[in-house]
Regions:
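Short acidic-glycine-tyrosine-enriched beta hairpin
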Residues: 7-9, 24, 45, 51-72
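Glycine- and acidic-residue-biased ligand/ion/polar-headgroup-sensing regions
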Residues: 22-25, 31-52
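Double-stranded beta-helix
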Residues: 56-57, 76-110
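A short glycine-rich, His/Asp/Glu-containing loop-to-beta-strand
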Residues: 1-29
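Histidine-centered active-site/metal-ligand motif
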Residues: 30-32, 74-75
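Divalent metal-coordination and catalytic microenvironments
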Residues: 4, 64, 85
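Active-site scaffold segments
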Residues: 37-39, 68, 84-88
């Protein structure tokens, strides 16, 4: 993730972040406290709403596509290899996982 503009951690400011993926990445169900605007710049990104991951619900967004995810709406996604998306909105940018065990930054149990 690269910050393009603003500070995603500074409350009340506007931020723009860019995410590039090399391989395929599954994004488990989560939500954000603020509205999220997603634009596909390259490749494909698949998105769906709901609190349970269901690949059959994913809708493919191609370059130039834009989607708005309202604050607190549960959603999930799938990055195809080599895609680039840009996300902007009002900070702070925070990810709240529907299932905390899905958080990729969570320490692994020993």
């Amino acid at each position: 993730m690269a910050v393009v503009s603003g500070d995603p951690d500074k409350k009340g400011g506007i931020y723009v972040i860019r995410i590039r993926t090399k391989g395929e990445v599954t994004v488990r169900p989560h939500w954000h406290p603020t509205e999220e605007h997603i634009t596909v710049l390259a490749g494909s990104f698949l998105l769906a709403h709901g609190d349970k991951y269901d690949a059959s619900k994913l809708i493919e967004l191609k370059p130039g596509a834009h989607s708005v995810v309202p604050a607190t709406m549960r959603h999930f996604g799938f990055h195809k290899a080599g895609n680039v998306i840009e996300i902007y909105g009002e900070a702070p940018f925070a990810i709240n996982w529907v299932n905390p065990e899905d958080d990729p930054n969570r320490p692994k149990a020993k």
